[in-house]
Structure formats: C-alpha cells, structure tokens
C-alpha cells in the first residue's frame, strides 16, 4: 500500500523543503533547557545488526493522518514532571501539544471529597515489540528506527488499572448491596510503525488507554 516503504530505503537528503519541515515537525525531539539530555544517538553508535540500524524513509512521516498523542517518536525519554506527575508530549503546533496526567495515587483526590471510582496508572512504554492490530493479528512493532542517521525510539503512553478491586467490594463508591462491580482496563487503537518482512508500514495497534468500572445488578433470590 501507499504507507508501505522498504526498510532498506535510504533516508534521502534531497527531499523538498516542505517535506523536510513536515518530517522535522512529526519527529521533533523532547529536549530539556538545562541540557542534561544527551545529544541524539547516531546510528553508527548502535551495535551492528540492531533494529536501530534499519533505515526508514522519511517519506513515511509525511502523512499525518490519524496521529495519536499517545504515540511518540523521540531521541530522548519523554519527560515526567515530578511535582504534578504530568506527562508532556511533543511540542508540536497541532493536537499533539497537550498534557496527560499520570494518576499514580492509591485513590487520587480530584477535589476535596471527590475520589476516582477506579485507580489507574499511566506510563510511557518504550520497548513494545509486538501488538494486536485492528484485524486481530499479532504484528511486530518497531522499537527503534534510523531516520536521517538519528536513532528514534517509538514510545506509547498507556493507562491501565492499578487494581481490579480498589476496595474489597469492587469499585470505590458503588453500593455493594445492590451492585457487583470491578475495575477493568479498556483499549483503543493507535497508528504505530510496524514491520513485516522487509516492509515498514503504519498499522492500527491496540494499547491500554483507560480504567473503567463495570457493574451488574445483584439479582435477589426469593427462594
């Protein structure tokens, strides 16, 4: 298909200015102003034969369809604010410019007297090698890519339940006299860079994205 490009295709430098700008915008790296982060890793610094030595054509990144803020290509680990525990995405000029809170408390308090029904934890997943695609097939996810002689890692921001039963009766705040309840992780599909044979391509893969409460009414037995 049009989104498939051989993994051996050279990362050419003769692209138009517009194409280069789009590629740069799509893969802008997260950098810290205090310069504590190292410089981008060069492909030649990687071990021979590693996945990072697979060269990906920049043309793959010219199409911006269906991009999710939960997928990040970066030479640096995504920053996590220690104070507010917020996760920052790429500072792009489009919908990627946003924050997602990483709820890490045992039972996070939103406002005084307000609690979450379920407890969730959000993390950046850096080494996802396989995933289920939208057709139900197991596919190989590219962890590292070589683009213009820089090594980028593909990160996924995933949210899942910390515990299926935050309280002994199930979900927090549910009337256990009338309802059975439990917390469960739900999923969505995001566009990720995968490989099949010698082809790199975009596929929709399933990742964890939320923790929700499932309830069912207790049926009374009248004998």
Curated annotation (Swiss-Prot):
Give the chief site where it resides.
Answer: secreted
Bias regions of kind Basic and acidic residues — which residues?
Answer: 22-34
Q: Highest taxon of the source?
A: Eukaryota
Entry's localization field:
Secreted
Q: Which keywords does UniProt give here? A: Cleavage on pair of basic residues, Disulfide bond, Glycoprotein, Growth factor, Lipid-binding, Metalloenzyme inhibitor, Metalloprotease inhibitor, Protease inhibitor, Secreted, Toxin
Tissue specificity statement from the Swiss-Prot or TrEMBL entry: Expressed by the venom gland.
**Glycan attachment residues as annotated in the record:** 127
Task: Give the similarity note.
Answer: Belongs to the NGF-beta family.
- Quote the PANTHER family the UniProt record gives: BETA-NERVE GROWTH FACTOR (PTHR11589:SF10), NERVE GROWTH FACTOR NGF -RELATED (PTHR11589)
Functional note:
Nerve growth factor is important for the development and maintenance of the sympathetic and sensory nervous systems. It stimulates division and differentiation of sympathetic and embryonic sensory neurons as well as basal forebrain cholinergic neurons in the brain. Its relevance in the snake venom is not clear. However, it has been shown to inhibit metalloproteinase-dependent proteolysis of platelet glycoprotein Ib alpha, suggesting a metalloproteinase inhibition to prevent metalloprotease autodigestion and/or protection against prey proteases.
Q: What is this protein called?
A: Venom nerve growth factor 1
* Species the sequence originates in: Azemiops feae (Fea's viper)
């Amino acid at each position: 298909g049009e989104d498939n490009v051989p993994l051996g295709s050279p990362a050419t430098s003769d692209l138009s200015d517009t194409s280069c700008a789009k590629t740069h915008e799509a893969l802008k790296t997260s950098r810290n102003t205090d310069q504590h982060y190292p410089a981008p890793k060069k492909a030649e610094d990687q071990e021979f034969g590693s996945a990072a030595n697979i060269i990906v054509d920049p043309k793959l990144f010219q199409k911006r369809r269906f991009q999710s803020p939960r997928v990040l290509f970066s030479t640096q680990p995504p920053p996590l604010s220690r104070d507010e525990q917020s996760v920052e995405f790429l500072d792009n000029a489009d919908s990627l410019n946003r924050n997602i809170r990483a709820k890490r408390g045992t039972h996070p308090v939103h406002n005084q007297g307000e609690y979450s029904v379920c407890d969730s934890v959000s993390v950046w997943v850096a080494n996802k090698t396989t995933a289920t695609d939208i057709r139900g097939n197991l596919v190989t996810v590219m962890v590292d890519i070589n683009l213009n002689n820089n090594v980028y890692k593909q990160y996924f921001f995933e949210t899942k339940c910390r515990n299926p039963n935050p309280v002994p009766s199930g979900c927090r705040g549910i009337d256990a006299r009338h309802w059975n309840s439990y917390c469960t992780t739900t999923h969505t599909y995001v566009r990720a860079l995968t490989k099949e044979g010698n082809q790199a391509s975009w596929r929709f893969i399933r990742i964890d994205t939320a923790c929700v409460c499932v309830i069912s009414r207790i049926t009374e037995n009248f004998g």
